[in-house]
UniProtKB/Swiss-Prot annotation:
Entry similarity comment: Belongs to the globin family.
Protein name: Hemoglobin subunit beta
Function of the protein: Involved in oxygen transport from the lung to the various peripheral tissues.
Gene name linked to the record: HBB
Organism the protein comes from: Rangifer tarandus
Oligomer and partners: Heterotetramer of two alpha chains and two beta chains.
Matches recorded under SUPFAM superfamilies: Globin-like
């Protein structure tokens, strides 16, 4: 999946990421841009507008939780399926999340990283992260197959 150089670039860069901010923004943007994903978060309260979503404390907290799991996954780039097995089971068997949503969130995360880091998020680094989010999405969807 990733070369040793790509792994080093991804994990090295991740140390600069403010997980709480990026996670909140990524999940918020997912819910705004793909409103059908809101059905999994109806218990989060007011999701009636983009502004309400982006300022919703439960969205922010869950976004951080999602990126905390992503951070843990970065420690296991050679075994993403193993690293995300329990989350895959939860999202498939209990929550019944459409696995396509994992791909969408990964793509949103890459956009948010680019927005936060500008030129420091180089095209090469973007390509590396795209590989990672694709791998994570596939790992999360593994239980569905």
């Amino acid at each position: 999946m990733l070369t040793s150089e790509e792994k080093a670039a991804v994990t090295g860069f991740w140390g600069k990421v403010k997980v709480d901010e990026v996670g909140a923004e990524a999940l918020g943007r997912l819910l705004v841009v793909y409103p059908w994903t809101q059905r999994f978060f109806e218990h989060f309260g007011d999701l009636s507008s983009a502004d309400a979503i982006m300022h919703n404390d439960k969205v922010k907290a869950h976004g951080k939780r999602v990126l905390d799991a992503f951070s843990d996954g970065l420690k296991h780039l050679d075994d993403l399926k193993g690293a995300f097995a329990k989350l895959s089971e939860l999202h498939c068997d209990k929550l019944h999340v459409d696995p396509e949503n994992f791909r969408l969130l990964g793509n949103v995360l890459v956009v948010v990283l680019a927005r936060h880091f500008g030129k420091d998020f180089t095209p090469v680094l973007q390509a590396d992260y795209q590989k990672v989010v694709t791998g994570v999405a596939n790992a999360l969807a593994h239980r569905y197959h």
